[in-house]
Amino acid sequence: MKFFIDTANLDQIREAHDLGVLDGVTTNPSLMAKEGIKGVENQRRHYVEICNIVQGDVSAEVIATDYEGMVREGKELAALNPHIVVKVPCIADGIKAIKHFSGQGIRTNCTLVFSTGQALLAAKAGATYVSPFVGRLDDICEDGVGLVADIVRMYRFYNYPTQVLAASIRSSKHIMECVEAGADVATCPLSAIKGLLNHPLTDAGLKKFLEDYKKVNE
């Protein structure tokens, strides 16, 4: 299991990196806007900054929704840094663009995936990653983790190399459910990653150890 952090916040990326478990970063236009990063050039400089911190895969999303625009933007993004993975929406022109990028050796992340059919087309087109959105499916009372498990089974059955990148993860519980479902990657907020450390018995045990140490060393 690889851990990606889903943010454009450099401080959070550095903190996750310093923890020693970070494998990559996913971003999107909403996360860029949240950080107040405006303008194409500023956003691209930001992607390079992220790549310099992480030294792992960084998903950078195209804004265009037409084939020619996605291909143009994707090539420009991929040229920024070898760690860039071009993030492409799961629409008809997006699948065409992924096929093109695959032929050019440009890695891709097919995003906004909500069904096994979409995941199948992404894999057939040669996507490096496919991103099923767990939390957003849960929001409409569908089984997001179940979709992750279904995609994993399908890819294994047909030996597709596309990696399942579980996205829209809201909690530490989501992470562990996706681990059990066989996801290759979980991209999540820093709070969910750090939440994996939390257990009351760990806190109680550490407190007891320290108290006992003080008793014999006073």
From Swiss-Prot:
Q: What is its EC number?
A: 2.2.1.2
* Pathway where this protein functions: Carbohydrate degradation; pentose phosphate pathway; D-glyceraldehyde 3-phosphate and beta-D-fructose 6-phosphate from D-ribose 5-phosphate and D-xylulose 5-phosphate (non-oxidative stage): step 2/3
Q: Where is the active site?
A: 87
Q: What protein is this chain from?
A: Probable transaldolase
Which InterPro entries does the record cross-reference, listed alphabetically? Aldolase_TIM, TAL/FSA, Transaldolase_3B, Transaldolase_3B/F6P_aldolase, Transaldolase_AS, TSA/FSA_arc/bac
Q: Could you tell me what reaction this enzyme catalyses?
A: D-sedoheptulose 7-phosphate + D-glyceraldehyde 3-phosphate = D-erythrose 4-phosphate + beta-D-fructose 6-phosphate
Keyword entries, A-Z? Cytoplasm, Pentose shunt, Schiff base, Transferase
Q: Which species is the source of this protein?
A: Bacteroides fragilis (strain ATCC 25285 / DSM 2151 / CCUG 4856 / JCM 11019 / LMG 10263 / NCTC 9343 / Onslow / VPI 2553 / EN-2)
Role of this protein: Transaldolase is important for the balance of metabolites in the pentose-phosphate pathway.
* HAMAP family cross-referenced by the UniProt entry: Transaldolase_3b (MF_00494)
Q: Which GO terms describe its cellular component?
A: cytoplasm
Family per UniProt?
Belongs to the transaldolase family. Type 3B subfamily.
Transmembrane segments annotated in the record for this chain: none
Source organism, top-level taxon:
Bacteria
- Give the subcellular location: Cytoplasm
Q: What is its main location?
A: cytoplasm
Q: Which GO terms describe its biological process?
A: carbohydrate metabolic process; pentose-phosphate shunt
PANTHER family noted in UniProt? FRUCTOSE-6-PHOSPHATE ALDOLASE 1-RELATED, TRANSALDOLASE
Gene Ontology molecular function: any one: transaldolase activity
